[in-house]
Amino acid sequence: MIENNIISDHFTVEGLKKLKITPPDAKMYKKILSNWDSVAKPLDGMGDFELLTAKIGAVLGDENIDISKKAVIMMCADNGVVAEGISQSGQDVTLAVAKSMARKASSVGRMAMTTGADTIPVDIGINSDESVKGLLQRKVRMGTRNFAKEPAMTKAETLEAIAAGIKIVRGCKADGYRIIAVSYTHLTLPTIA
């Protein structure tokens, strides 16, 4: 799947600034809402569902919304700031959760299964060299550094991590995915946020 879809872009700060994301199609958004208004129901009777479908259609640029092929990309990494004692558990939990994701046994995996979405767990920086079947290997480094003492990542590592995410999404698009959700696992989100 994604492993076979190699994209050889070399990312730089300047290159990232030049990336263009097509904005949602405002006319399509209005058209889809108008289509809902022609359905036999009270005006806005479907509530937020009408707005959600209009947003999806505007992003896809198509009023015939097809999200039959969907994925959840789950990025897994450890953060060095855990050394400050700010987490109730150690970094070994990240690896355990990633293994659970690879088996589709995590909460995200189970929710994805109920919607028919594929799951793509990614090791972007787990502090372990263990190879896990079903876990896409895109490791930038073995966990970040402790940002309480030094920068968590170098500029080059940051660019590599961003590039990895872009390449995974491009691979999904090339594989026919119509909608992608993202998730993550690490133990220190409240601290790094």
Stretch-by-stretch model annotation:
Residues 60-68, 112, 171-175:
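Solvent-exposed alpha-helices and their adjacent loops that cap or buttress functional pockets
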